[in-house]
Amino acid sequence: MKQKKNLSGRIFNISRKLYLKKMLLPAKLLESINRILFSCEIPPSADIHPNAIFGHNALGIVINEQTFVGENTVIMHQVTIGGNMGKYRLKDKQKIYAPTIGKNVMIGTGAKILGPIIIGDYAQIGAGAVVHKDVPNKGVAVGIPATTIKVLSDKEAIEAYSKI
């Protein structure tokens, strides 16, 4: 992984740690600072791995508070990760309205990932794609609505991710 954590990512990580320690006011204050500086909405309740990368300082990124994002995932600018008109899935008897995104995923600029779907490890989401169905591990999803056009081999997936 060539990229390093940028300022918006650092602010989010501190906000998340404060949130987990039940220090809600400072956590929300940092969320607001990110919103003002980078026009992004990344709530501290979102379970985003500390090693996830926000491209271009998270400019215009909007993420649902129930979202899970795995390690080393790259989320480019203008991405929306959110709910889909009240649709949900059950996980441990709890309603989940937002996407679950695996590790080492690449989400291209302007992509929209909507609803209680699962994006598998090493998946690639094309720029501008509107994803409302699950994407398998190592799947490549593009288009509006997005379709999985290919499932990469292990070698292809690792090679593609290493170029980010």
Label each residue range with its predicted role.
Residues 92, 123, 141, 158-159:
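Glycine-rich, phosphate-binding/catalytic loops in enzymes
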Residues 85-86, 117, 152-153:
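Conserved catalytic-core motifs of eukaryotic protein kinase domains, centered on the activation segment
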Residues 38, 43-44, 49-50, 55-56, ...:
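Left-handed beta-helix
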Residues 1-39, 146-149, 153-164:
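Terminal amphipathic alpha-helical/low-complexity segments used for targeting or macromolecular assembly
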Residues 89-97:
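Regulatory activation segment
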